[in-house]
């Protein structure tokens, strides 16, 4: 009752290409809402709009529709809005293409390389805050 609405933003990263899991290359932003069942469409639409305007690739409810946290905690009817955001590593690090070994993984963190994606994440989180405080 103290917080009539909350947003659970479950964000983590994955290699952009993982042949044993999927073909091709993942978009940089993979948004999962359990096919819209885990959060209000207004929240999802805003996040998608931010990602679409960022210049980074994105998809909603593609390969990653939302894991356990999104599916079990997202309950918009009771004010709990859950969004999974799976980030492809190439969006924030100079990810090696092809086989990985100790010479190319993990790549060093470069704040300048990561800055554009960080700004998009900041806007996504600001949208989440605006959504729960409106």
Labelled PLM ranges:
Residues 1-95:
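Catalytic cores of processing enzymes, dominated by hydrolases/peptidases
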Residues 97-134:
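His/Asp/Glu-rich mid-to-C-terminal helical/loop segments that flank catalytic regions of hydrolases
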């Amino acid at each position: 009752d103290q917080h009539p609405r909350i947003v659970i933003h479950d964000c983590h990263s994955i290699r952009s290409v993982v042949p044993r899991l999927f073909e091709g290359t993942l978009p940089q932003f993979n948004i999962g809402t359990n096919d819209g069942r885990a959060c209000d469409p207004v929240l999802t639409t805003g996040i998608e709009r931010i990602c679409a305007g960022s210049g980074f690739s994105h998809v909603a409810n593609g390969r990653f529709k939302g894991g356990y946290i999104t599916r079990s905690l997202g309950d918009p009817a009771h004010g709990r809005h859950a969004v999974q955001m799976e980030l492809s590593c190439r969006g924030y690090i100079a990810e090696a293409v092809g086989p990985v070994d100790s010479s190319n993984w993990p790549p060093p963190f470069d704040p300048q390389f990561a800055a554009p994606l960080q700004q998009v994440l900041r806007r996504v989180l600001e949208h989440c805050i605006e959504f729960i405080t409106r």
